[in-house]
Swiss-Prot record:
It comes from the Bacteria. Its cofactor is [4Fe-4S] cluster. GO terms for cellular component: cytoplasm. Pfam families: Radical_SAM, RlmN_N. It catalyses: adenosine(2503) in 23S rRNA + 2 reduced [2Fe-2S]-[ferredoxin] + 2 S-adenosyl-L-methionine = 2-methyladenosine(2503) in 23S rRNA + 5'-deoxyadenosine + L-methionine + 2 oxidized [2Fe-2S]-[ferredoxin] + S-adenosyl-L-homocysteine; adenosine(37) in tRNA + 2 reduced [2Fe-2S]-[ferredoxin] + 2 S-adenosyl-L-methionine = 2-methyladenosine(37) in tRNA + 5'-deoxyadenosine + L-methionine + 2 oxidized [2Fe-2S]-[ferredoxin] + S-adenosyl-L-homocysteine. Belongs to the radical SAM superfamily. RlmN family. S-adenosyl-L-methionine binds at residues 164-165, 196, 219-221, 295. This is Dual-specificity RNA methyltransferase RlmN. Gene3D superfamilies: 1.10.150.530, Aldolase class I (3.20.20.70). Binds 1 [4Fe-4S] cluster. The cluster is coordinated with 3 cysteines and an exchangeable S-adenosyl-L-methionine. Keywords: 4Fe-4S, Cytoplasm, Disulfide bond, Iron, Iron-sulfur, Metal-binding, Methyltransferase, rRNA processing, S-adenosyl-L-methionine, Transferase, tRNA processing. [4Fe-4S] cluster binds at residues 112, 116, 119.
Length: 358
């Protein structure tokens, strides 16, 4: 039984011709029903013959992730706990911006292998990669949900900043990006998609850059290799200087810059000396910085705390004084554990990690 949402347009054409004996033109019809009209049942495809629909039901399935729980924050953030076909749980978050625009934070793996010490997802360990249909199923769930909201907000931006490291699931990420960008698919411009990476896969970074299918964000969080090795032990396997050198040759569009994400941890990476080191590092690239304040887990064993307001502002002001664009990003959804670093999918609670506004 074929997961039809896991087929690219070209793969769908091949499936219809070789498996079902259909003409190629059927692919466009079926594709539009799947990705533009969001149908869940082949019988809803009214311009497809009954015979073809019967064959589709026999040989294929349309599977959307099951919404287990929906949580709504006081700030308007919405979090979905989703169950995949094999029972695995992941989360996705809708973050409200201005003028009714919504940013969706997407997961790409069940669990995460990176083990970053400040991120709840890191405690889960890695279970498996998500498929294209599972990744894009999050978008289908979001669009269906938003269509039923009275204000009809617009799903404008997608950020791969949820569970998992995108460049460790590169093949499915690339397949997903092609479908997202397709005029026949979900019709998202590359300028509305951001892929975030810890920097663990040089070949993946090269392929993503050459594709031009998304903007790049870098989960940096430390200005030196030594500190990065302490708080992001697996990400630090790629030497920071080598990573920055790779970013120097990363292809950027006109006026495009690489976004560096920097989570401020009180007493760990938030001093003036850290700010100076950070300036020396990121000034080697076309960069802008998103400063994200740590969200305490509430666990007594949590080794980290948020910096003081004074230290946050001093850090930001130093960056600006050295002509480095830096924005303090407000993490939304903390009251439902949907803020940065809180992602830990579970039926008893849990959540993803974004601090992205439109």
């Amino acid at each position: 039984m074929v997961d039809i949402l896991n087929l690219t347009f070209e793969e769908l054409e091949t499936f219809l011709v070789e498996k079902l004996g259909e003409k190629k033109f059927r692919a466009r019809q079926i594709w539009q029903w799947l990705w533009n009209k969001y149908v869940r049942d082949f019988d809803q495809m009214t311009n497809v013959s009954k015979q073809t629909r019967a064959q589709l039901k026999e040989h294929a399935r349309i599977f959307w992730p099951e919404v287990v729980t929906t949580s709504k924050s006081q700030d308007g953030t919405t979090k979905f706990l989703l169950r995949l076909a094999d029972g695995a749980l992941v989360e996705t978050v809708l973050i409200p911006g201005s003028q009714g625009r919504i940013t969706q934070c997407l997961s790409c793996q069940v669990g995460c292998a990176m083990g970053c010490t400040f991120c709840a997802t890191g405690t889960l360990g890695f279970e498996r990669n998500m498929t294209m249909s599972e990744i894009l199923g999050q978008v289908l769930v979001a669009r269906e949900y938003l269509n039923d909201v009275a204000e009809r907000p617009i799903l404008r931006n997608l950020v791969f900043m949820g569970m998992g490291e995108p460049l460790l699931n590169l093949d499915e990420i690339m397949r997903s990006l092609h479908t997202l960008n397709s005029e026949l698919g979900l019709q998202f411009s590359p300028r509305r998609i951001t892929v975030s990476t810890c920097g663990v896969n040089p070949e993946g970074l090269r392929r993503l850059g050459e594709s031009g299918l998304a903007y790049l964000a870098v989960s940096l969080h430390a200005p030196t290799q030594e500190l990065r090795r302490t708080i992001m032990p697996k990400a630090a396997r790629w030497e920071l200087n080598d990573f920055i050198e790779a970013l120097q040759s990363y292809p950027l569009k006109t006026r495009e810059r690489i976004t560096f994400e920097y989570l401020l941890l009180g007493g760990v990476n938030d001093s003036l000396e850290h700010a100076k080191q950070l300036v020396r590092l990121v000034s080697r690239t076309k960069a802008k910085l998103n400063l994200i304040v740590y969200n305490p887990s509430g666990d007594e064993a949590d080794p980290y705390a948020a910096p003081t307001e004074e230290r946050i502002l001093a850090f930001e002001q130093y960056l600006w004084s050295k002509h480095v664009t830096a924005i303090i990003r407000k993490s939304k959804g903390a009251d439902i554990k949907a803020a940065c670093g809180q992602l830990k999918a579970a039926e008893t609670g849990g959540t993803p990690c974004c601090a992205q506004n439109d």
